[in-house]
Amino acid sequence: MNEPVINELGINNADTYINEFGGLVTDNGHASAEIVIKMTDVSKWYGDFQVLTDCTAHVHKGDVVVVCGPSGSGKSTLIKTVNGLEPFQKGDIMVNGISVGAAKTNLPKLRSSVGMVFQHFELFPHLTIIDNLTVAQIKVLGRKEDEAKKKGMAYLDRVGLSAQAPKYPAELSGGQQQRVAIARAL
């Protein structure tokens, strides 16, 4: 096992296990040799305040990654840089061979290949569970409603919630809502 490389944010090397300080966590027995996310020396500032410092990680296809650390350590910022929601000032991030920071990159298309679930995942309370899974597929990816619902139901089935599809988020437990968020990310 590699020794953890932890910067002042508590995050740096995705090929390490979690330690008491927090960090990026993956299983060193990678599911695939294919690297789908490659982050190299990524740094980000908000004005004079440096939020990310030389973050480097390689995530292989099939890996599950958890980003953890203390409040304000840059976890959300790091994740948002991976899918282009936050610009970064130094380094490079490649997702499926596409540079996130390149001006010509089609960010909506790139984002469709990166699934994330945040601790506070915010389901749309006015939409049914199945509609929570299909809205982005229809509006962002341009899928037809019947195709989006079919995919959404398949993912709800994977997380054991297909029977909950017509319900609203408030009708589900917190754990069930989290599983809906996971299905949506998938």
Predicted segment positions?
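Pre-NBD coupling/linker segments of ABC/ABC-like ATPases
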Residues: 2-33
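ABC family nucleotide-binding domain
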Residues: 20-23, 32-186
